[in-house]
């Protein structure tokens, strides 16, 4: 187990990628504190993992929720080694022209208070504990932190902001605390919800046929599941393997950034080459 006796805090840990991270970290020997708004989801975590999990109901938009979670984490487990900012919402690729003028302020504030301020507040609350443990921070970014069309103007702008935060916080907090990010693409099993301000709060990404949409776009030829993406988080959370690693964002998106203009990949060339028996 690669995270034996490590203590981790995950925001948005009750569903989708967040739940997959919690499950994987517990399996790797970690003890995990979770901050989430879902009472039912928190109860499911307690039932699944027992004393390995501390579950706190709260809202990432408020510093007090983060402070309460950090305090309960340290009180229960004695320390905090890694903070994972993961809670977020999506705009379902709503273009600026599609956002009504009378909803733009509300939609902007909702997006940035959750997807940007929520991360910053979490780190602020965890600073003392992470300094004491010489710990680390991991942010869930997105392919939208690097490229257009992974969301609309609100989501893409927010994720670009997180890339900047990774770099700035790595500078400000080093050498005591490492700060890195992981930028997944679309994930199977994701429960990412939309903006309430755009009437998308009850829409779940799990209902969108992303797999069919992405299979011909990604160089890998398939969309990753949430569970398949957790290995990157384990890697960044380990101490022995990542001593010099800070200020980095790992593209974990199926190769979106290397697809060609007209084809997602040219693996057909290998198929043709080997089918002719050129190499065995």
From Swiss-Prot:
Its EC number is 1.3.1.56. Pathway: Xenobiotic degradation; biphenyl degradation; 2-hydroxy-2,4-pentadienoate and benzoate from biphenyl: step 2/4. Substrate binds at residue 142. The active site is at 155 (proton acceptor). Pfam families: adh_short. InterPro entries: BphB-like_SDR, BphB_TodD, NAD(P)-bd_dom_sf, Sc_DH/Rdtase_CS, SDR_fam. Disulfide bonds: none annotated. One of its GO terms (molecular function) is cis-2,3-dihydrobiphenyl-2,3-diol dehydrogenase activity. One of its GO terms (biological process) is catabolic process. PANTHER family: SHORT-CHAIN DEHYDROGENASES/REDUCTASES FAMILY MEMBER. Belongs to the short-chain dehydrogenases/reductases (SDR) family. Has a 50-fold preference for NAD over NADP. NCBIfam families: BphB_TodD, PRK06200.1. This is Cis-2,3-dihydrobiphenyl-2,3-diol dehydrogenase. The lineage of its organism: Bacteria, Bacillati, Actinomycetota, Actinomycetes, Mycobacteriales. The gene is bphB.
